[in-house]
Each structure stands twice: as C-alpha cells, then as structure tokens.
Amino acid sequence: LDREHAVPRRDALYMLGLSYYQTKVYSKAAETLGKVTTENDALTQNAYLHMGLSYLQLAEKNKARMAFEQAAASNANMQIKEQAAYNYALCLHETSFSAFGESVTAFEKFLNEFPTSPYAEKVSSYLVEVYMNTRSYDAALKSIDRIAKPSAQILEAKQKILFQLGTQSFANADFEQALKYLNQSIAIGQYNRQTKADAYYWCGESYYRLNRMVEAARDFNAYLQLTTQPNNEMYALANYNLGYIAFHRKDYTQASNYFQKYIQLELSLIHISEPTRLRRI
C-alpha cells in the first residue's frame, strides 16, 4: 500500500489483476487491471492487453476491442503492441457491421507494421476471406495495393481479384478494360495456374471481339497449354474459337482439325447449351 494515501500501488494492483486472470477470475481481473491504467507506460499497456483478454473470456467483445485498441496505441513494448494490434483487428472483424470496413484497415495496418509477425499468416487469411466473400473487388484491389509487403496468399487473392474484374468488364462489353485486368492477372499468375489459364481464355475472347485475331489465337493456345482442366466446356470452346479464327484466315485444313477436336470434346461432355455452341454462326 501507498502509506501516505492508503491506496494500493499500481504494481501491486497489476500483479493482483494478473493473478485473477491466471486463475480465470476474469471479471475481477478486468476490474482490477482497469485501476492500473492511470499512467502512459508499459504497465498500463500490459494491463490493457490483459483486460482485453479477460473481456474476450467474458464474451464482451466490444469492451475487449476498446482495451486492445488502447494497448496497441502504446509503443512502450512492441511485443505487447503486436499482440494487442492483432487482437484488436480480430475483434473488429468479428464485431463489424460492415462486411468491408474498419477490420480491413486494421488488418492492413497490422501487416505493414508487423510484416514478419507470427500472426501475419492468419491476418492474411482473414483479409483474403473478406476480399473473396464480399466481392468488393475494386475495394479489395486498393486494399492490397496499400500493403507494403503482401504475402503469397494475398498476391494469389490479387491474381484472382484481377481476373474477376476482367470477367466483369467482359460481361459489360468493355473488352479493352477486360484485357487490362486480365493481363495484370496473368502477369502475377505464378500463384494459381488455373486462374492464369482462365485469364488467357478470356483474353482470347476479348481479342476476338475486338477483331484482333492474331492475339486471340495466341491466348487461346496459351490457355490450352496451361489449363489443368482439359475436359470442360471452356477447353472445347477454345478449340471451337481457334477453328473459326483459322476459317477466317482461309486456313481450312487447320480449321477442320480444330472443329473435329471440338466435336470430339463436345461428345465427351455431359452438356453444352445450344446457344453457346452456335453463338458465332
């Protein structure tokens, strides 16, 4: 006790609060540690961290989030800051009413501040989950570009996001913009081979509609060489499209070969809709 004021010293309260936490008396731990946070120092930072952890055990995530935010704001101990920042971002993710909101910003900030953290892989996973599940592809791309050292997991997500933006542009008949996105996806295509192959296919479709037949043929061939799924509709249609390109340049022998290949593939497939098969006639 501080004899002059007859109140417990901060370090004594801190140790008592930790004792409550370690013995799983979480409500007492949070209450006691809250009395420690009167100074801007390492003791306060660690008290806030354990208050947050206590509130998590009490299923009071909003209170936990606020405690973690306080601990993460301090630079007194960088390991404590790292743990608090991770838990703060996670609480935001779990309590956010916006699918693509504050939690993404918090995860970005964490990865930029602690790129080598043992939590970095989990944070990357949470970000990828948000990117792909919300389908807010433009916002996701901007988010990734704000991360100084994105992980391979996030770069694979970027590859897929660029592909999705490309196919959206294609669906809107904006073939030039589709090519920009798809070629960016191809440029970082080492993370997912099938996404890269599919990007080549849709580049071929875009070039075809722009009457750029040489590039269309090149990319349809790149798709055929790269795809890991040679028995699906796109594989058959790539041969069909190459047949038409050969036909237009009056290479009837090669056109015939591609059309025969298309027919063989078609017969092996369960179903290709009639409008799709006849769309170029």
Residue ranges and their predicted role:
Residues L1-R10, K35-Q45, A71-K81, F97, ...:
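Short solvent-exposed coil/turn linkers within tandem alpha-helical repeat scaffolds
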Residues T23, L58, T95-F97, T134, ...:
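Structural motif corresponding to the intra-repeat A-B loop/turn of tetratricopeptide repeats
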Residues Y26, K61, S98-F100, Y137, ...:
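TPR-repeat structural position
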Residues I270-I281:
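Single conserved hydrophobic/aromatic residue that forms the stacking wall/gate
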